Amino acid sequence: EVLSINCSYSKEGKYPSHNLISKQHRPKSKLVINSSRGEVIDYSEIVNTSIVFNDVWTNEPKISPSDIFSFLDNSNAFGTPHIAGYTFSSKERQIDLILKKFNDIFSKSVERKEHKKLKRLSSCLPEKLTNSKNLDFKSIILEVLSTRKISVEFKALLYEFKRAGKSFGSKDFEKLRKSKMRQGFDDICIDLPMDKQLLEKMELSGFQKYEK
């Protein structure tokens, strides 16, 4: 039903991933999610037979706005500006890796002074949902991260540039991407009552247990 692509990109070697998913290698999946590299799938072709959610684009950051706009103009197409892993927690993990490398190279034991602060789930949801006795997984996820909304905003911005006769360049793409830095699921703690089944789904998705 769902094909999620997370591989590295290569044009050579025994198993090149360039155009791994294409007209010649069309997936049977109803939904294709690409968060690897834009060149891994021919998204303009695959969107004709599958719902495609694309987070990465050909020739980033020197993208082709017209190609992306044409892709997003399909009813089966959704796209975001390379933000799949663009969270505060991922940045913190990068800092931890850099700090570890520094300590290893210079035989130091420098520690971070700042510690990760979790955001409460209740602060991410509207009041009508936090007060609901029937919380459901889909409603929570759509409130915490509405990728569909981001896709609509992305397309609208491309259209705005096009209408104004301006070129949407690499700097504009990076500016948009940086504006979408967000709380990852692992940055959020569960502080609302919910049944065991829902709690398990939330924790499997990365949400943290609330500790008083």
Regions found by a protein language model. Name each.
Residues 9-11, 56, 77-81, 102-107:
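Glycine-rich loops and low-complexity Gly/Arg-rich segments
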Residues 63-64, 75, 88-212:
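NAD(P)-dependent dehydrogenase/reductase Rossmann-like domain
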Residues 4, 70-72, 96-98:
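Short, hinge-like loop/turn segments at secondary-structure boundaries
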Residues 12-14, 86-89:
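A generic structural signal for short coil/turn motifs at secondary-structure boundaries
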Residues 1-69:
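Rossmann-like adenosine-cofactor binding region
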Residues 69-87:
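Short FAD-binding loop at a beta-strand-to-alpha-helix junction that anchors the flavin cofactor
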